[in-house]
Amino acid sequence: ILKDIKEYNLENRVVITSYDWRILYELKKQNLNVLRGFITLQQSLTKTKKNIYEDSPWMGKKFSPDELFLLPDTIKNLEGHVWSVFYKDVTKQNVEIAHKHGLAVTVWTVNREPDILRMIEYGVDGIITDYPKKIQEICKSKNISWF
């Protein structure tokens, strides 16, 4: 994939995002110009287990309790570009911190109107949803110019 990204000069237009941070570390070793997005999940879901916890193999190395708690700081220190966070784990304060660090913030999987509106209010940069048309309709009906 790196070969194609380089060949078509897409380094600053493509974000490679992963739940397994070890992949992102390897990408950094191979090419510093590839934008990297760090997926975080601090609570287990029905089909997906959390990846942010002490000694998590998904994080690829050991982090202090502060680093596990202050994820925007941790991702900045890892020279990441995007924090892709489960929407129930994000706060407005963390979005503001991430933006101060120059990180874009995307949230996933946001499907309910109250949650969509809250994420827009928080100032996230992107919403991953199963219902993109629903977000368009909500924004249009409420005169929200978000995207």
Enumerate the predicted regions with their spans.
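Short loop-to-alpha-helix "cap/lid" segments that border enzyme active sites
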Residues: 1-147
